[in-house]
Amino acid sequence: IILTLSLGGILMEMGLITLVINSLVRKLTATWQLIVVTLLSSIGVNIFIGEQFLSVILPGNAFKDSYKEKGIDPVVLSRTLEDGGTVINYLIPWGIAGSFVASTFGVPTLVYLPFAFFSLLSPLFSIISAVTGIGVLYLEEETKKPIIEN
């Protein structure tokens, strides 16, 4: 865990993550595209590094300014990172959570994968929410505070 967090710190300080994300974000035009790319990058970090904390921290730091520029509430970023980062880690055999569950219960990850409904459906619902705009909150223009609707 310490080594992976160190790797994440090095990547952030070198500016590699920000450079890649900024070049990608410039090509995105719609809000739903930003949300889906955030989700996919969080899943990608999970797959390549296998550490759920980095799958939230790296994309979170990289995309937070893009969300603010587009006027999207940080709650949407938080939810997207959760859907693509934390809950997916149980499905990655070499991930921290996946290896813990597999070793604790003695069941390989690929065996319990079809029954992990929440982990499988959460990213799907996040994409549906982004495309339809349901649950996507925006900030007020003047104050950049969350808009609370009753």
Where would I find each of the regions flagged by the language model?
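Membrane-embedded alpha-helical segments and adjacent helix-loop junctions characteristic
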Residues: I1-D65
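Juxtamembrane/interface motifs at transmembrane-helix termini
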Residues: L39-S42, S55-L58, V76, G95-V101, ...
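Alpha-helical membrane-embedding segments
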Residues: I2-G8, L54-D65, P93-G106, E141-N150
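Juxtamembrane helix-boundary/capping and inter-helix hinge elements in multi-pass membrane proteins
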Residues: E13-L16, T29-T31, D65-L77, S103-L110, ...
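Alpha-helical transmembrane segments of multi-pass membrane proteins
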Residues: Q33-N46, K70-L91, A97, P114-L121
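Structural signature of transmembrane alpha-helix termini at the membrane-water interface
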Residues: L11-M14, G44-F48, L91, A102, ...
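Juxtamembrane and boundary regions of transmembrane helices in multi-pass small-molecule transporters
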Residues: G98-S103, V107-N150
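Hydrophobic transmembrane alpha-helices that form the pore/transport pathway of multi-pass ion
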Residues: V45-D83, P108, K145-I148
